[in-house]
Amino acid sequence: MTAIACIEDLRKKAEKRVPRMFYDYADSGSWSQSTYRANEDDLQAIKFRQRVAIDVSVRDTKMPMLGETTTMPVALAPTGLTGMQHADGEILAAKAAADFGVPFTLSTMSICSIEDVAAHSSAPFWFQLYVVRDRDFIRRLVDRAREARCSALMITLDLQIMGQRHKDVRNGLSAPPKPTLRNLINLVQKPAWCLGMLGTKRRQFGNIVGHVKGVKDMSSLADWTVSQFDASLSWDDVTEIRKQWSGKVIIKGILDAEDARAAVNIGADAIVVSNHGGRQLDGASSAIKALPAIVDAVGDKVEVWMDGGIRSGQDVLRAIAMGAQGTLIGRAFLYGLGAGGQAGVTQALEIIHKELDLTMGLCGQPELRKVDSSILLAAESDHR
């Protein structure tokens, strides 16, 4: 059996175990996928300064995110259809995150419901909200997150209009999924995945089915979902949601300094510099290239985090050195989930933590809290 050494090894294992339509859903970008690729490539272009003869015998990777102590500044990002990478996927990922000491974020478009995750997780989690046309549903959803004791509300703003993802079109993947004959054949070639799905009752969007009038089956769910993208979404709408939620608010999907300042003005506690993993506007900036200008624009008024392209602990360190106060991972933990369930997510976190710790040591920096652009080669730090 091949040993797992890095996130790429988990990706290869997940690709073998997860049905093609669901694997492709997680592992693809929009249109030509140029932004999807740039997220990774631009991180890899950032080079470190190797330092020697510095005492790094004791190293500390802990940093707070919204006042919550974390083993490392890495949160599990909200990802739709997580429960289709592995049966009960959201529950398993939340458990792994809680045990490891990092935050977990549940997506509106999750398979397991808010209540499911709350009942099985040993720690509070964050809830991610899509602002859809049905504002009554939004209000009820926010109330449910409050009742589940979610410690923060993450509002995603970059999905007013769905970007086109060619692989999803070819696979017949919609919301909910409509498998093609080819994909049905592929499903039966994944026996472990199928057995897992047969063993759970959670196979639909748990936050929606049973919570929206008239949505009782796959057909009515599909009709409702298609009708709910809200191209008219404005900062006034976000302000109203902010008033409803008394806890911490995170605004996700920021790539422009002007939008970052607007998020500060509505009372955000943190913002996530993100291009939705390269799944929305192809040709947009990579997250890491957008990060410095946004950090400069908001200063210390709000925590600035980043997601997109993070596949290693080295990438986490690059983001922190470029000014981020935290990071989120999506695909990296989904690969672990698809490869091995809860244990696979834990393995992904262990890999990233080990890489982060070792790279700090090789850069002569024992404390992550003190990391800045001085650990990068001059050409990279000039961008800060």
Q: Where are the regions that the model predicts?
A:
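Short beta->alpha linker loops
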Residues: 30-31, 108-112, 133, 255, ...
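Short, conserved beta-strand segments within well-ordered enzyme catalytic domains
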Residues: 47, 62-64, 73-77, 103-107, ...
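A gly/proline- and charged-residue-enriched helix-loop-helix capping module
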Residues: 98-120, 124-138
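Alpha/beta enzyme core
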Residues: 81, 95, 120, 136-306, ...
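Short, basic, glycine/proline-bearing loop/turn elements
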Residues: 75-81, 124-130, 222-224
